[in-house]
């Protein structure tokens, strides 16, 4: 490792050895090992040494110029920072294999040189620590020491490689026009005048004009760029409608990156005088991309964000149905939740029955999961509502509002109003679930005791149910786990909705050979339409039920504190316990407070997790939660009843 005071001798040694790569590598190592505050001074020292030793400066610039003229540049231009063509699966396997058996690096290929120079994941730290002005100063000194003929030779080499890279990128973009996935999503790509193909024709003419130093009217070229960008955005949105796989999302992201790189290179080579600022910015992008070239975590983070967008988009579409904005929607939500409360009370009773007839923990957990899963599916099919299912949907809708609106006070007011609408909707849904589930449970317990003369639950079962809702006995932690499963069920629903669109489930089922034998055409089409529209919701509800039922079993088998508490089932169990145990009124109110606390944790955890994922998938963020909270307080101060009831809704 070289020291700053040994830098002059190091430069002389590398010049004598004719080792340009070693010179650049040593300089990068010196900058990498320097504290952040000393990185710029170290680069200033390098510039100072060259300025004050003309002979050394001329030797270094001649060495670097000759080295660059002998390198292949275009592989770096067309690949660095752009997703590979192999797809997510192939790229993941390549990066994992690279960890165990690194590939050979060719120091005559600038792409490999960048990887060797910037192989540390923290290299972005020192790259970003150097102002652009400092880099321009260093290259300015090197340029002054370079002879005119060498400058011309380097310029011609860079231009030749750059124009070739531009041609290759335009060919790639035009070739994607025939990708089966893109044609499935947008059949108009089959037209001969596709924007991708038209852009390629314009780029070919532009490159020919540049090689002949002819002025080129690029007005139509810019129109083609705009149309290609609009088409890619349209395809990304179309994916949420017709469904998209991870590979499709990966393809669209690569197409977008390729188009952006093409535009950047054309902006650099548009004239004979290259703007140093643009070249340096592009070089910085190459350096950061090289540092992340074999990063598995970076690939996973990038790729998972691609598919998350379409998943949360499907969740957001459902979320709009769970937000009430007038009295009609408010009472419809209440009646829907009340219907859900009826089935929840029966599901809780059946769970108690299962516990009394099944002793084996594994079979009991499986039976409880099936009880929950099929119960939630029936609730959904009857158009009833489970209150805590909505946050996973409404959070995605909230994130969409952040993306669609500009930043500022208007946005904060809209988000605050949306939060108030969501809170009111959740409140009435919880109220419908809790009141009806608890009331029906109490009625069933009363009728049972009246008919048999014995309470539905004995003292041991009552004590067990009270223990389950006590905040001091971990009920809030278990409620948080249920909130995580609520979040997961929303993601699962979104994924399978996307999958249904991607597979064109409607047409598959309508033309299924077996269904043709079993059902009439009318029934088959109706069944196909229903499954296509509700595929994700049915699977999401079933998976949510299984997760609830099996969590306690996993906790039992692993001896970990794992279980679930759900507000609706806790309220039903409280109804059975209250009548069986003849609770005193104050104690009963305390138990209701505990149940509502469980519901609050269910809602907060599921909403927060889904909002975080939705914001990330949309690549957006909320500037100030405090400002939104201030707007919420303003709304509550002006229209306090609108927080809970469908009144004072005039904006």
Language-model features: locations:
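Juxtamembrane/interface segments at transmembrane-helix termini
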Residues: 1-44, 49-55, 59-62, 357, ...
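Hydrophobic alpha-helical transmembrane segments
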Residues: 272-289, 307-320, 369-380, 422-432, ...
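Core alpha-helical transmembrane segments of integral membrane proteins
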Residues: 312-410, 430-450
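Long, compositionally biased intrinsically disordered regions
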Residues: 186, 211, 231-267, 278-297, ...
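Soluble N-terminal domains of membrane-associated systems
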Residues: 1-311
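Generic detector of multi-pass transmembrane helix bundles and their immediately adjacent loops
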Residues: 374, 389-391, 400-569
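Alpha-helical transmembrane segments and their immediate juxtamembrane interface regions
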Residues: 336-339, 343, 347-350, 363-383, ...
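Catalytic cores of large soluble enzymes that bind and process phosphate-bearing ligands
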Residues: 220, 243, 247, 254, ...
């Amino acid at each position: 490792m070289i020291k700053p005071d040994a830098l002059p001798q190091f430069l002389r040694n590398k010049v004598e050895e004719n080792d340009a790569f070693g010179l650049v590598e040593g300089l990068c190592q010196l900058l990498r090992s320097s504290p952040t505050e000393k990185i710029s001074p170290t680069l200033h020292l390098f510039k100072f040494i060259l300025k004050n030793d003309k002979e050394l400066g001329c030797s270094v610039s001649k060495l670097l110029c000759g080295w660059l003229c002998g390198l292949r540049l275009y592989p770096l231009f067309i690949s660095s920072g752009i997703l590979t063509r192999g797809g997510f699966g192939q790229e993941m396997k390549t990066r994992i294999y690279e960890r165990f058996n690194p590939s050979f690096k060719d120091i005559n290929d600038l792409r490999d040189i960048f990887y060797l120079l910037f192989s540390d994941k923290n290299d972005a730290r020192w790259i970003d620590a150097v102002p652009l002005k400092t880099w321009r100063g260093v290259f300015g000194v090197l340029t002054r020491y370079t002879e005119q003929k060498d400058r011309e030779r380097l310029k011609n080499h860079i231009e030749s490689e750059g124009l070739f890279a531009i041609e290759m990128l335009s060919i790639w973009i035009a070739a994607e026009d025939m990708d089966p996935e893109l044609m499935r999503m947008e059949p108009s790509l089959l037209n001969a005048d596709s924007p991708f193909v038209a852009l390629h024709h314009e780029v070919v003419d532009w490159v020919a004009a540049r090689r002949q130093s002819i002025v080129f009217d690029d007005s139509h070229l810019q129109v083609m760029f705009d149309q290609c960008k609009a088409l890619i955005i349209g395809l990304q949105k179309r994916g949420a409608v017709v469904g998209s796989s991870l590979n499709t999302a990966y393809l669209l992201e690569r197409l977008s990156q390729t188009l952006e790189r093409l535009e950047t290179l054309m902006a650099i080579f548009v004239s004979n005088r290259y703007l140093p600022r643009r070249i340096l910015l592009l070089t910085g992008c190459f350096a950061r991309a090289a540092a992340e070239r074999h990063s598995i975590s970076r690939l996973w983070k990038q790729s998972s964000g691609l598919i998350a967008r379409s998943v949360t988009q499907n969740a957001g579409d459902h979320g709009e149905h769970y937000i009430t904005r007038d009295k009609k929607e408010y009472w419809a939500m209440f009646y829907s939740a009340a219907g859900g409360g009826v089935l929840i009370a029966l599901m809780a009773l059946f769970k108690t029955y299962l516990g009394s007839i099944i002793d084996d923990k594994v079979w009991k957990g499986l039976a409880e999961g099936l009880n929950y899963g099929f119960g939630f599916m029936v609730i959904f099919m009857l158009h009833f509502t489970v209150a805590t299912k909505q946050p996973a949907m409404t959070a995605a809708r909230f994130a969409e509002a952040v993306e669609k609106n500009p930043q500022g006070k208007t946005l904060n007011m809209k988000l605050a109003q949306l939060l108030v609408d969501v809170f009111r909707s959740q409140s009435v849904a919880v109220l419908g679930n809790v009141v009806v589930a608890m009331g029906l449970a109490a009625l069933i317990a009363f009728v049972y005791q009246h008919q048999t003369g014995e309470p539905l639950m004995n003292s041991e079962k009552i004590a067990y149910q009270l223990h389950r809702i006590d905040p001091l006995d971990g009920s809030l932690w278990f409620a948080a786990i249920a909130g995580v499963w609520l979040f997961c069920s929303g993601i699962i629903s979104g994924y399978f909705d996307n999958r249904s669109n991607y597979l064109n489930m409607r047409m598959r089922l309508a033309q299924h050979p077996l269904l043709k034998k079993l059902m009439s055409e009318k029934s088959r089409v109706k069944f196909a339409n229903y499954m296509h529209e509700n595929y994700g919701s049915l699977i999401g509800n079933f998976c949510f039920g299984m997760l609830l039922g099996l969590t306690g079993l996993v906790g039992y088998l692993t001896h970990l504190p794992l279980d679930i508490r759900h507000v609706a089932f806790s309220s039903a169990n409280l109804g059975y316990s209250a009548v069986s145990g003849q609770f005193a009124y104050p104690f009963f109110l305390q138990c209701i407070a505990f149940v509502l606390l469980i519901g609050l944790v269910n809602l907060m955890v599921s909403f927060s997790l889904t909002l975080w994922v939705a914001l990330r998938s949309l690549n957006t963020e909320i500037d100030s939660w405090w400002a939104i909270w201030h707007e919420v307080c303003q709304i509550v101060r002006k229209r306090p009843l609108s927080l809970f009831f469908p009144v004072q809704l005039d904006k």
